[in-house]
Regions:
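Alpha-helical transmembrane segments of multi-pass inner-membrane proteins
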Residues: 2-25, 38-103
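Membrane-embedded alpha-helical segments of multi-pass membrane proteins
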Residues: 41-51, 88-92, 223-230, 271-279
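Transmembrane alpha-helices of multi-pass inner-membrane enzymes
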Residues: 249-260, 267-301
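Long extracytoplasmic/lumenal interhelical loops at the membrane interface
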Residues: 23, 27, 34, 161-220
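A membrane-periplasm/extracellular boundary helix in multi-pass inner-membrane enzymes
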Residues: 101-158, 181-183
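Hydrophobic transmembrane alpha-helices and their immediate junctions
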Residues: 63-66, 99-106, 111-112, 219-258, ...
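Membrane-interface micro-motifs in multi-pass membrane enzymes
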Residues: 33-48, 209-212, 217-224, 265-272
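Aromatic-anchored segments of alpha-helical transmembrane domains
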Residues: 9-16, 73-79, 123-128, 254-263
Length: 301
């Protein structure tokens, strides 16, 4: 089920992009297309969260041509989007499976397979070094660096450059929101300051930090963050007491947690959080057989 959803989302990005019918990922300056979707952050997060289930399924089939072709199509689609989140998730997933198989091969002393795998890994890295500079993703990095007038590595010693380039000014918005939160009464600290800053003035702002943990803490208060994240903490504790849950679910949840911090629009966006909630429910209640019956196989290697 979840792997099929991933394919649907991917096709609704890939096909419009190939036909040049997709919507732009950015309004100005940067390039990229998100197909027939509306916002890059949300669809990027959905793709990232569902990706482990699809990759897990094709790797489990052990059909090398299908694995190779799928990875190429996914990589191409993600680079045409021009955003960082999905590519970061893609890299984390591949590294996870590489390490997993690497440890298995060493344990089984299959040194010939180990040599082939290592050689293939080196070839892939070299190929990526040649391909990535030609992608939309890389061009966006250059556009961003030119905008910031970054000419050498030492320029990144400037915290403002780091904030703008890596966090897209999220740290600046975080600092501004902290000031508002600190000035608020106890009731606002408990229940949140809401989603409108400077209400009733000429400087009204609805700009969020886009780092979900901080947005929830400041906008919905201490009570809000305890209620929302209490379920995730319970899920992690449940995992410690059982070995029935496959790692692919935890990998997807891990990506959700990382993206919620780095890019936002995961827990605070209903279109994304519905998938996070589904995965948490499957982990917490152990309803793995329901997914297996929908032909989403788990990797038992």
């Amino acid at each position: 089920m979840l792997s099929n959803l991933f394919v649907i989302y991917l096709l609704f990005i890939l096909i419009p992009n190939v036909l040049n019918l997709g919507f732009g990922s950015y309004e100005i300056t940067k390039k990229g297309s998100i197909g027939w979707f509306y916002t890059a952050n949300e669809v990027g997060a959905i793709i990232s969260i569902l990706m482990p289930f699809y990759l897990n399924e094709i790797i489990n089939k052990k059909n090398k041509p299908i694995i190779f072709l799928s990875i190429i199509i996914i990589f191409y689609t993600l680079t045409t989007m021009g955003t960082k989140g999905p590519l970061l998730s893609f890299g984390i997933i591949l590294i996870y499976y590489f390490i997993k198989y690497y440890k298995k091969i060493i344990k089984e002393k299959k040194y010939k397979t180990l040599g082939i795998m290592t050689t293939s890994f080196i070839i892939v890295i070299l190929a990526l070094m040649m391909i990535i500079p030609k992608t939309t993703f890389y061009k966006n990095i250059i556009i961003h660096l030119d905008f910031l007038k970054v000419e050498k590595i030492s320029d990144f010693k400037n915290p403002k450059i780091i904030d703008h380039f890596i966090f897209s000014q999220r740290l600046t918005f975080l600092n501004n929101t902290v000031k508002i939160y600190n000035k608020s009464p106890i009731s606002s600290k408990l229940l949140g300051v809401g989603y409108i800053d400077n209400y009733g003035t000429d400087q009204v702002s609805m700009k969020m930090i886009e780092m979900d943990y901080f947005d929830i803490l400041f906008r919905q208060g201490i009570i809000g963050i305890v209620i929302i994240f209490g379920g995730i903490v319970m899920t992690i504790n449940k995992k410690k007491r059982t070995k029935k849950i496959n790692d692919v679910y935890l990998l997807s949840l891990f990506l959700s947690i990382i993206l919620a911090l780095l890019t936002g629009h995961v827990i605070t966006s209903p279109s994304v959080s519905i998938y996070v909630a589904l995965i948490i429910d499957l982990i917490y209640n152990g309803n793995i057989k329901e997914i297996e019956n929908d032909k989403t196989r788990v990797c038992n290697c």
